[in-house]
Regions:
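Two-component histidine phosphotransfer core
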Residues: 1-239, 245-251
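C-terminal end segment of the histidine kinase catalytic
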Residues: 236-280
Length: 280
């Protein structure tokens, strides 16, 4: 036992009377369980650090920012000042929420505003080749969500879905948010070209079959960040068929947004700490 306390792993002789053998087995089993627990904690910590770094890097995509500024420059040169002002305003909203004072947990209303601004900018880039509709129940706005989980799904809807469709094809992306019992579901659905069964089966894994271009890695990151914050019963669900479109569902617990809940969640104490129903 003293060797265990010192961090060593001595061989245990299990022999003698039945009581001694039982004690030996118990000590050995306890140590094995502690080792497994420590390995799991280390794995989760490494995964959390990786997910947080990936999220930080995706907050302001240099290519997206460059393309947006190029579009604004073109508008100014073409004397489309009203359009340029609109784009600058949307970009400012997007950057404000992306940074959000370094917070990881934000209101769903802010996440949806970020998504609206992102899509308004992308629609200009894609020359209005698709439409976007947001159907968000008002009663979900003041609940907690992990920051920047909708944008990568919208990117996926453009890349795999409507981005390559002509304007006459009627491309559309719909974002729907609703609360059911103690859970919240945010669904992003498009009527684009869809994904193969192989891609769907692997897109939320680290499998090498996941495409490394587009937002395949982004979806894995979103799924991992949600599960690390709220638990393995939450995350993303992906449904898609070639030429039929794609539907991706974000599933999170319904936790009212207030300062106490935000702080507790960001400390990774959900499930142990007390979250409140009070709004601030």
């Amino acid at each position: 036992v003293k060797a265990y306390e010192a961090g060593e792993k001595p061989d245990i002789y299990v022999g003698g009377s039945s009581e001694i053998r039982h004690l030996g087995y118990s000590v050995q089993k306890s140590y094995e369980q502690i080792e497994e627990l420590m390995e799991e904690i280390i794995r989760q910590q490494n995964q959390r650090r990786k997910s947080e770094m990936d999220a930080l890097q995706s907050q302001i995509n240099p290519h997206f920012l460059y393309n947006t500024l190029e579009s604004i420059t073109w508008m100014v040169e073409a004397h489309k000042n009203t359009d340029a002002v609109f784009m600058i305003s949307e970009l400012a909203k997007l950057l404000r929420i992306s940074l959000s004072k370094g917070r990881t947990i934000i209101r769903i209303s802010d996440e949806i505003q970020h998504s609206r601004s992102y899509m308004n900018i992308q629609k200009v880039r894609y020359k209005e080749r698709f439409k976007t509709e947001f159907i968000i129940d008002e009663d979900v706005n003041d609940y907690c969500i992990v920051k920047l989980v909708v944008q990568p799904i919208l990117e996926n809807a453009i890349y795999y879905g409507v981005g390559n469709m002509d304007e006459d094809d009627g491309g559309k992306i719909t974002v729907h948010g609703e609360k059911k019992d103690d859970d919240i579901y945010i669904t992003v659905e498009d009527n684009g070209m869809g994904m193969s069964e192989e891609v769907v089966d692997n897109i939320l894994s680290d499998n090498e079959k996941v495409p490394k271009h587009g937002s395949g890695v982004g979806l894995i990151n979103v799924h991992n960040r949600i599960q690390l914050m709220f638990g393995s019963q939450y995350g993303l669900q992906v449904y898609s068929e070639p030429d039929e479109g794609t539907r991706i569902v974000i599933h999170i617990p319904a936790i009212p947004y207030n300062e106490q809940n935000r702080v507790e969640l960001e400390k990774q104490k959900y499930g142990k700490a007390k979250v409140t129903d009070e709004e601030k």
